[in-house]
């Protein structure tokens, strides 16, 4: 049975931990010069309704590094669900006959669900108006790489500063799934909606994590291990003007040296990028030693490699020769012990 990656709610804590381990293992091997050809002769179809830098480049690079190929499919170049063209469902069915896996970055969550329901190959959500799950995996990998001494993920506190964007919501999903303390520090009217917050609270009940929404600076930042923000204007639709948005968030919700000083001394700064320097974050923070934003961007690639291998593993019959040719036995062990709660 095929599995999609539309929302981390469909994945267990153990499966997400497996994706972390798999991603870091492949990253380690590639850094050592070993490019495991796990996706040889496989093709990824990439559907983009929205523009992208990190998502597109990381998926294309991941496929190339692992021996496969990626095709970029823009709405103006193919028939994609408009009134004058093929339906979304029919497009997904056709593409399923031509590629091995699909990724779509689309404007609405209904669109990705329509594609996933019709496709007969695995479908990855490259971002919708609701969530950004591939970013979630890159983020949790980054936090796993930069854990404070003596701490596990479940011991850590992550604070999202600002508006309840798709990235904020997605960070809550994965942090609470992994037993972390999640805080959104943002103004009323721009906080996570109750029905969405309930998902994080349910995750926390199971994992032992916690969720807090607050406007109190000291309460939010106290003992924070990771401080995360996203843009205030430009990437997301808003009826407000630039000046109106700035008046809501600036200066209280800007991540600057003063705000970082309220977090734990070892706290790391994160940003999904692109950043509007001088708005949601200052140069002094983004370019500081505490910033792991560039590692986070690189780990989009780490996440994509893990997700592609994980989702395609059931349809690829790895021969003993392929596995035995892997230079690192740790990767072979991971592939032989794939965690899948659907089985």
UniProtKB/Swiss-Prot annotation:
- Keyword GTP-binding assigned to the entry: answer is no
Q: What reaction does this enzyme carry out catalytically? A: carbamoyl phosphate + putrescine = N-carbamoylputrescine + phosphate + H(+)
Query: GO:BP terms for this protein?
Result: arginine biosynthetic process via ornithine; citrulline biosynthetic process; putrescine biosynthetic process from arginine via N-carbamoylputrescine
Extract the PANTHER family matched here. Answer: ORNITHINE CARBAMOYLTRANSFERASE, MITOCHONDRIAL, ORNITHINE TRANSCARBAMYLASE, MITOCHONDRIAL
Q: Which Pfam families match?
A: OTCace, OTCace_N
Species for this entry: Latilactobacillus sakei subsp. sakei (strain 23K)
Q: What is its quaternary makeup? A: Homotrimer.
Q: Where is this site: Important for structural integrity?
A: 27, 145
Q: What class of enzyme is it?
A: transferase
> What HAMAP family does its record include?
PTCase
Residues binding carbamoyl phosphate are 52-56, 105, 132
State its role: Catalyzes the phosphorolysis of N-carbamoylputrescine to form carbamoyl phosphate and putrescine. Is involved in the degradation pathway of the polyamine agmatine.
Residue ranges the record marks as coiled coil? none
Q: Which amino acid positions bind putrescine, per UniProt? A: 271-274
Pathways per UniProt: Amine and polyamine biosynthesis; putrescine biosynthesis via agmatine pathway; putrescine from N-carbamoylputrescine (transferase route): step 1/1
According to its record, what are the GO cellular component terms?
A: cytoplasm
Q: What is this protein called?
A: Putrescine carbamoyltransferase
Gene coding for it: ptcA
The GO terms this record gives for MF are: amino acid binding; ornithine carbamoyltransferase activity; putrescine carbamoyltransferase activity
Keywords, sorted A to Z: Cytoplasm, Polyamine biosynthesis, Transferase
Q: What is its EC number?
A: 2.1.3.6
**Family the UniProt entry places it in:** Belongs to the aspartate/ornithine carbamoyltransferase superfamily. PTCase family.
Q: Which Gene3D superfamilies match?
A: Aspartate/ornithine carbamoyltransferase
Query: InterPro entries, per this entry?
Result: Asp/Orn_carbamoyltranf_P-bd, Asp/Orn_carbamoylTrfase, Asp/Orn_carbamoylTrfase_sf, Asp_carbamoyltransf_Asp/Orn-bd, Orn/put_carbamltrans, PtcA
């Amino acid at each position: 049975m095929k599995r999609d990656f539309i929302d981390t709610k469909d994945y267990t804590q153990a499966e997400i931990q497996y994706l972390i381990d798999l991603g870091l293992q492949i990253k380690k091997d590639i850094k050592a010069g070993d490019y495991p050809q796990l996706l040889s002769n496989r093709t990824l179809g990439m559907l983009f309704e929205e523009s992208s830098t990190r998502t597109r480049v990381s998926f294309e690079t991941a496929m190339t590094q692992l021996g496969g190929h990626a095709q970029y499919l823009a709405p103006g170049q193919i028939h994609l669900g408009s009134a004058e063209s093929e339906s979304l469902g029919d497009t997904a069915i056709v593409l399923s006959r031509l590629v091995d896996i699909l990724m779509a970055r689309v404007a609405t969550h209904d669109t990705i669900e329509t594609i996933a329901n019709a496709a007969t190959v695995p479908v990855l959500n490259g971002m919708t108006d609701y969530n950004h799950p591939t970013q979630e995996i890159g983020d949790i990998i980054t936090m796993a790489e930069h854990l404070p001494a003596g701490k596990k993920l479940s011991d850590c506190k992550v604070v999202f500063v600002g508006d309840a964007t798709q990235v904020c919501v997605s960070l809550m999903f994965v942090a609470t799934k992994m037993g972390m303390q999640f805080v959104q520090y943002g103004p009323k009217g721009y906080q996570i909606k109750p029905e969405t917050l309930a998902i994080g609270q349910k995750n926390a009940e199971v994992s032992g994590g916690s969720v807090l929404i607050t406007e109190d600076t000291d309460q939010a930042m106290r003992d924070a291990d990771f401080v995360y923000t996203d843009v205030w204007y430009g990437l997301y639709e808003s009826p407000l003007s630039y000046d109106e948005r700035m008046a809501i968030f600036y200066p209280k919700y800007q991540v600057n040296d003063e705000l970082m000083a309220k977090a734990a001394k070892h706290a790391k700064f994160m940003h999904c990028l692109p950043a509007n320097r001088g708005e949601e974050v200052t140069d002094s923070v983004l370019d500081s030693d505490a910033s792991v934003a560039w590692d986070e961007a690189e780990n989009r690639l780490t996440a994509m490699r893990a997700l592609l291998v994980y989702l395609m593993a059931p349809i690829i019959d790895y021969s003993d020769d392929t596995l035995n040719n892997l230079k690192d036995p740790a990767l072979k062990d991971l592939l032989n012990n794939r965690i899948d709660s659907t089985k």
